[in-house]
Structure formats: structure tokens, C-alpha cells
Amino acid sequence: KRAVQSEKRRQHNASRRSMMRTYIKKVYAAVASGDKEAAQKAFNDMQPIVDRQATKGLIHKNKAARHKANLQ
């Protein structure tokens, strides 16, 4: 039973981590394109998702803070 639960949790966490990384990449892409408005929108979309993953324990709160600080 524990093995099944662990696998289910691992897949769920992998999905959430992938989603978070995608949002972060979108911010980097928008910044690289030079479109300030798109970059701001991408950052505003990314910020609550990163915070939520830190609250849920997927990443450490300091890592979430570092991602946000590096992208501001």
C-alpha cells in the first residue's frame, strides 16, 4: 500500500513541479523578448503559483523567494 501511495504522490509532485517550472520559463522568455507588459503579466501569473507550491511543501519557502527575487 505504501509503495502505491508513494508512487501516486511522486507523480503528483512531478506534475506540480513541471507546471511551476513552465511558468518560470515563460517569465524568462517574456523578459528575453523585451516585451515589458508581457513580462509583467507572466511574472504576476507565476508568483502565486510559486508561493502555493512553497506553502504545500513542494519547494522550500526560501527557494520560492529566490525565484521571485531573481525575476523581479
UniProtKB/Swiss-Prot annotation:
This protein's name: Small ribosomal subunit protein bS20
Superkingdom as given in the UniProt entry: Bacteria
InterPro entries in UniProt: Ribosomal_bS20, Ribosomal_bS20_sf
BP GO annotations: translation
Species whose genome carries this gene: Proteus mirabilis
Entry's Gene Ontology cellular component terms: cytosol; small ribosomal subunit
Keywords: Ribonucleoprotein, Ribosomal protein, RNA-binding, rRNA-binding
Function noted in UniProt: Binds directly to 16S ribosomal RNA.
Keyword Magnesium: no
Family listed: Belongs to the bacterial ribosomal protein bS20 family.
Molecular function in Gene Ontology: small ribosomal subunit rRNA binding; structural constituent of ribosome
